[in-house]
């Protein structure tokens, strides 16, 4: 990491059949980004040229970057076949997979400090023979890390308060969640979260709210036994192991998000925690997307470099129409630059 210059970010195009190229062109036209980072896109100039021509033909007033003038690492994969806008397939999956891997290779080689990824389609990856659950798992595999997690960060445009949420489990069926949750898993995720808060946000003595699994956190075993069986005992041990953190919970899931809702919408000074640890995908992401859909950013913690991405998908249904919003991608770029800057600051002891 080069702490003597502006953060060096590499931005992938994501699936070229989705809204990735559109939101990348819109983000690169955003004034002010050049003052906070050195931003390089990685992908195919032909894809960006075609996207720009198509969008401007529909709406000449769109503010789009010119592919001929942006910093671009060319990865020409046109030989793989034709891209059909709005339709993810084996061709678009192979291309987006190649974009990501080239970005990882360059970052691991020290050319960049952070990767910002536009969205991909898991179905397109699978059609191309790449059977990863998502970009997060590819990043972890290529970086050689076994302990990693998905965290979501959003800053309220109303109050300035920042919501930080980590998922203990991610893309697994709901019926598998109780078996996947173990004290060992929770310890690993909590350690990642505490490291992230200290390293990336400068919060060395955080408060962390931890959700229960069952309605009313099991209501003393009447609505589920996981809290009594292991979650409460685990929390008691965790409080001893991590005295620097205030660990609150297990909190009934239906009330854990009341404080964040108030802090996000009306009162940034209300009583809230520095971070929220949700036990499964929808428990954490329904409130995140309800409050912060256009501002929420996915960041992978546990990697040796910064990675962020917008918290939305490829949106094939609106690709090529010029109506995709770049807010989340712009926020992802800004957050990546902030996290790189934070990692360059001396850590408080």
Curated annotation (Swiss-Prot):
EC number(s) given by UniProt: 1.1.1.262
Associated pathway: Cofactor biosynthesis; pyridoxine 5'-phosphate biosynthesis; pyridoxine 5'-phosphate from D-erythrose 4-phosphate: step 4/5
Originating species: Synechocystis sp. (strain ATCC 27184 / PCC 6803 / Kazusa)
Protein residues bound to a divalent metal cation: 171, 216, 281
Superkingdom to which the source organism belongs: Bacteria
GO MF annotation: an example: NAD binding
Note in the entry: The active site is located at the dimer interface.
Alphabetical UniProt keywords: Cytoplasm, Metal-binding, NAD, NADP, Oxidoreductase, Pyridoxine biosynthesis
Gene that specifies this protein: pdxA
Predominant location category: cytoplasm
Cofactor(s) this protein cannot do without: a divalent metal cation
Keyword RNA-binding in annotation: no
Name used for this protein in its record: 4-hydroxythreonine-4-phosphate dehydrogenase
Assembly description: Homodimer.
InterPro entries cross-referenced by the UniProt entry: PdxA (IPR037510), PdxA_fam (IPR005255)
Catalytic activity reported: 4-(phosphooxy)-L-threonine + NAD(+) = 3-amino-2-oxopropyl phosphate + CO2 + NADH
Residues annotated for substrate binding in this entry: 136, 289, 298, 307
Entry similarity comment: Belongs to the PdxA family.
Compartment(s) of residence: Cytoplasm
EC supergroup of this enzyme: oxidoreductase
